[in-house]
Regions:
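A glycine- and small-aliphatic-rich helix-loop capping segment at beta-alpha/alpha-beta transitions
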Residues: 109-118, 196, 265-272
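N-terminal intrinsically disordered, low-complexity, charge/repeat-rich segments that act as generic
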Residues: 1-19, 205-212, 247, 261-267
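Phosphate-interaction motifs
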Residues: 2-168
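Solvent-exposed alpha-helices and their adjacent loops that cap or buttress functional pockets
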Residues: 57-59, 84-90, 103-104, 117, ...
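Short glycine/threonine-rich loop/turn motifs
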Residues: 212-337
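Phosphate-binding glycine-rich loops and their immediate beta-loop-alpha structural context
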Residues: 133-250, 255
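C-terminal terminal segments
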Residues: 58, 69, 75, 123, ...
Length: 400
């Protein structure tokens, strides 16, 4: 099994290595999907305007579209949804108009109801200014304008924008993540019996994948058998060459105990190891590799708290690179002053779960690799490198 990084890579270097591996693999394949299926994906192409916004001169207020100075004789009414009028207003005339309705040719402004005075004989008067409360055609966006560049995450606002620009579908990237949950002791429903544990990592991965612009596939559940794990990885590698997984997350089996077979299974398949252990607490026994002509593999520790740290360290940078978007944990780095003492580790970077309150970060406590109580109540992790003396620390965000 070829190796690239030495054992126990520095935490920040491991994140860079994961990002670089995703970038070398290239962005995942683009697919054109209906708007209803695009939320959370990443734009694979620029988003052009197919129509102008607005597509004709429209009223920004309920009131009267007027021509020239007042008073004005009201000659009709125009509601939203009406076709633009062919006949132009002439000086001294007006039409009653609804917000969003097309203003007639010749309109110089719109006089809102609240500024209008009704006069005898079907006339109105009031103070207005040229072009006031008229939205001109293409004022916001002209046909052909690029409203968003490729690489933008598809948010609810992006879906609304795309619809307003005339799109029914979008070209997007959403890498697929195959999930292998290992462990003879792991149960997936109900209350575990003596000597068993409930799978707490598998339920986290869809949210982590979404956060990074990817999609987690339903998990495959495996026992602690080397051959079974190798076969599952081989299957993922074959799928990765076609329309299958772009990356694989293996839950458990990344340590070096008697039932941890990930390294040996990867060796059987001739995988290239990129990161073999990360100098961080929790999350030390995490692993990053690439199968020959196949997807990247992230080995997550079996302890749930450690697995979440590995998700932030290796999985999110890898998946976001495959999606062609920034790493969500590093897109907006923060620094905050810790409100309580934290002791650094002599050799490893500590990831301490914190709540953010203004410019301060409050350690949550319950920092145990086997527990999710701490990150479940946190906004992010404070990064505490060896030799740290505080009080400022880098903050890495958690998905919310």
């Amino acid at each position: 099994m070829a190796r690239r990084e030495g054992a126990s890579a520095a935490w920040d270097r491991a994140r860079v290595a994961a990002r670089e591996l995703g970038e070398r693999a290239g962005p995942s394949a683009a697919r054109r999907v209906p708007l209803a299926e695009a939320l959370g994906a990443t734009l694979a192409a620029d988003l052009p305007a197919l129509v102008g916004i607005p597509d004709c001169d429209t009223s920004a207020m309920d009131g009267y579209a007027v021509c020239g100075p007042g008073p004005w004789r009201v000659t009709g009414r125009v509601l939203a949804g009406a076709a633009p009028a062919d006949e132009a207003l002439t000086p001294g005339t007006a039409v009653e108009i609804a917000t969003g309705a097309p203003v007639p040719p010749g309109s110089t402004s719109v006089l809102p109801y609240e500024h209008a005075r009704e006069e005898d004989g079907g006339t109105v008067s009031g103070e207005t200014e040229p072009d006031r409360h008229v939205r001109r055609a293409g004022e916001d966006t002209r046909p052909g304008d690029v409203a968003l560049k490729q690489g933008a995450p598809v948010t609810p606002a992006v879906l609304g924008l795309a619809a307003s620009l005339g799109h029914d579908a979008l070209s997007v990237r959403r890498p697929s993540l195959a999930v292998l949950v290992t462990g003879d002791e792991v149960v997936h429903t109900g209350i575990p019996g003596p000597g068993r544990v409930r799978d707490a990592i598998g339920p986290m991965l869809p949210g982590l994948a979404d956060w990074a612009g990817a999609r987690a596939e339903p998990p495959a559940r495996l026992g602690d058998v080397r051959e079974g794990l190798a076969e599952a990885l081989r299957s993922a590698a074959g799928a990765g060459a076609g329309a299958g997984a772009d990356a694989v997350a293996v839950c458990g089996a990344s340590s070096k105990g008697p039932a941890d077979h990930l390294r040996s299974a990867l060796e059987d398949l001739g995988a290239e190891t990129v990161v073999d252990g990360v100098a961080c607490r929790p999350g030390h026994p995490q692993l990053l590799a690439r199968l020959p002509e196949g997807p990247a593999v992230v080995g997550l520790p079996g302890n749930p708290g450690a697995a979440l740290v590995a998700g932030v360290t290796l999985l999110a940078p890898l998946l976001s690179a495959l999606a062609g978007r920034p790493d969500p944990a590093a897109a907006a780095p923060d620094r905050a002053e810790l409100s309580a003492p934290v002791r650094p580790h002599p050799r490893d970077t500590r990831l301490v779960a914190v709540r953010l309150t203004g410019s301060a970060a409050e350690p949550v406590g319950h920092d145990r690799p086997g527990s999710l109580r701490s990150p479940a109540a946190a906004d992010g992790y404070a990064v505490i490198p060896p030799g740290w003396s505080g009080p400022l620390a880098e903050i890495v965000r958690l998905p919310r």
